[in-house]
């Protein structure tokens, strides 16, 4: 019989619009709070929960990773604690 028919090209999906990047959210939280000793992780999380529409249970490991990478890159300065605990300031 005949040759196989070609399938119609499927329409391209638009890129998924998820939550904003974590590091700008953390930087915005720290600068908005303007705490003298630096901002604690709990305060940063509560600021993000209050000001962004995000699911905090899914976001917590991403916040920890963003804090560690921010300290490693020099964008954030860790005043007290180690890892993703303690208090943080902007670079």
Curated annotation (Swiss-Prot):
One Gene Ontology molecular-function label: nucleosomal DNA binding
Localisation per UniProt entry: Nucleus; Chromosome
Keyword annotations: Chromosome, DNA-binding, Nucleus
GO biological process, one term: chromosome condensation
Residue span of region Disordered: 1-25
Ranges of biased composition (kind: Basic residues): 9-20
Gene3D superfamilies the record matches: Winged helix-like DNA-binding domain superfamily/Winged helix DNA-binding domain
Family annotation (Pfam families): Linker_histone (PF00538)
Covalent S-S links between cysteines: none
Record-linked SUPFAM superfamilies: Winged helix' DNA-binding domain
Gene Ontology cellular component list: nucleosome; nucleus
Segments forming domain H15: 18-91
Keyword DNA-binding tagged: yes
Annotated function: Histones H1 are necessary for the condensation of nucleosome chains into higher-order structures.
Similarity-based family: Belongs to the histone H1/H5 family.
Protein name in the entry: Histone H1, sperm
Higher taxonomy: Eukaryota, Metazoa, Echinodermata, Eleutherozoa, Echinozoa
């Amino acid at each position: 019989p005949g040759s196989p028919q070609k399938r119609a090209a499927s329409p391209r999906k638009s890129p998924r619009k998820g939550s904003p990047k974590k590091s700008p959210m953390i930087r915005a939280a720290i600068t908005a709070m303007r705490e003298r000793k630096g901002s604690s992780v709990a305060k940063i999380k509560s600021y993000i929960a209050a000001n962004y529409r995000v699911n905090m249970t899914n976001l917590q490991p991403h916040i920890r990773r963003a804090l560690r990478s921010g300290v490693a890159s020099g964008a954030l300065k860790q005043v007290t604690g180690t890892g993703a605990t303690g208090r943080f300031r902007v670079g």
